[in-house]
């Protein structure tokens, strides 16, 4: 009799254990059946909202601007940025550092942003010349993270750009010539500045700057911008942003294209109807060029050359690259 009771107790315990094991298995299968995004798999929480869609354009335009340069930005909006082609052709922002600004300056920028929505505000950056290299790198890194684009034009807020001509030239390129593009007006014989505003005390590479496209305006392909963002923590920043960019891209397999139609030196060479970008423009210059384009389909009311230009000789040493001659725009 005792043996029967023991056998019964063992059978009951075994049955209860089997039921518990089956229940656990069913619970596990039910949890696995819920999709990762299903609220049942998230302890009753609602699923996270979808990530916002990235802006997209063929050509991005980043204009480095100062907090108090609202009038310049207004003129650019109404002149060369107004000629941006079809939807999806051009995406543009004015980049402004806001660290250290007073309350009134911040409010003015907030009002401008509310009205136009085209400011790229950089709260971690104090807008000053000595921070220009960090600013340009921050602009490019932000662009790579937030916008789908093929090319970017970096310009200053005293530059005038022919977006229609730039778009046409870039679209006409063969696929192989759209990769690793660094396009502008190059210098290879720039002597290292020992003093003044452009002093580069930390430059130790050689007695000349490495070949670089002058900063009044240049074009980069998206793959180079992506490379710069991924490398940003390892890049040495010098005072001049264009000199820094030339050094950063020096060891990279890029297509450096010197183009005299980029009038982007520290002083304008004049006015040519061939120019794609013209630096050192007053507000009156911009308004006149825009009006002449609208009225006559050409950039200049009257073509004039104030300084000679050059074609970069890539076969010569950098110090002998750039001989100015007649007949070059």
UniProtKB/Swiss-Prot annotation:
Intracellular or extracellular location(s): Golgi apparatus, Golgi stack membrane
Principal localisation: Golgi
EC identifiers of the protein: 2.4.1.134
Catalytic activity reported: 3-O-(beta-D-galactosyl-(1->4)-beta-D-xylosyl)-L-seryl-[protein] + UDP-alpha-D-galactose = 3-O-(beta-D-galactosyl-(1->3)-beta-D-galactosyl-(1->4)-beta-D-xylosyl)-L-seryl-[protein] + UDP + H(+)
Sequence ranges on the Lumenal membrane side: 35-329
Family (UniProt): Belongs to the glycosyltransferase 31 family.
Annotated disease: Ehlers-Danlos syndrome, spondylodysplastic type, 2: A form of Ehlers-Danlos syndrome, a group of connective tissue disorders characterized by skin hyperextensibility, articular hypermobility, and tissue fragility. EDSSPD2 is an autosomal recessive form characterized by an aged appearance, developmental delay, short stature, craniofacial disproportion, generalized osteopenia, defective wound healing, hypermobile joints, hypotonic muscles, and loose but elastic skin.
Protein name per UniProt: Beta-1,3-galactosyltransferase 6
Gene assigned in the entry: B3GALT6
